[in-house]
Amino acid sequence: VAGDKVTYEKLDLPTGLWPFNVAVAPSGKIALTADSGDAGGSDGSVDTISVVDLEAQPPRIVDRVVVGDGPEGLAISPKGDVAVAVILAGSNNKPAYFYHRNGSLAVLRIDGKKVTKIKDIEVGGLPEAAAFTPDGRYLLVGNYLDQDFSILRVNGTNITDTGKRFKVPGHPASVRMSPR
């Protein structure tokens, strides 16, 4: 990017299969991609998050973290010490053998360029969207089928479900937060 011009530098990165979302850490040192697997969604098999070293010349994939079946939404906290991958877990495919009523979050600790899965948290039906509040104290997860958002509390790398939700008039497939 130079001013108002964007050029393709012909740098393709071999992320995992079907990369769906990309999130860049606030430090600008790493990016994460949600690799949804062979089906491009939930298929009963585990999938990964690719870790991209943006400081390497050229940037490259330095790790993959197994997160669960069908990572879709992806968010990194404002401090950059924790991320979440929204896991479909079969919640989009009721007749399938791998169906689960609810999806989950894979909570990922970020320490420099090392990313580690630390726990899973169950959320609602077909979760897709995730965003941290600007102050980093809360995380909102959009549950598409339930037409609501789960509200989770964030304390450092510890994320817990408050048990509270708020309804929306549509199906939350994505979400963004603004500082104002």
Where are each of the predicted segments found?
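Predominantly soluble domains enriched in secretory-pathway, periplasmic, or organellar proteins
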Residues: 1-180
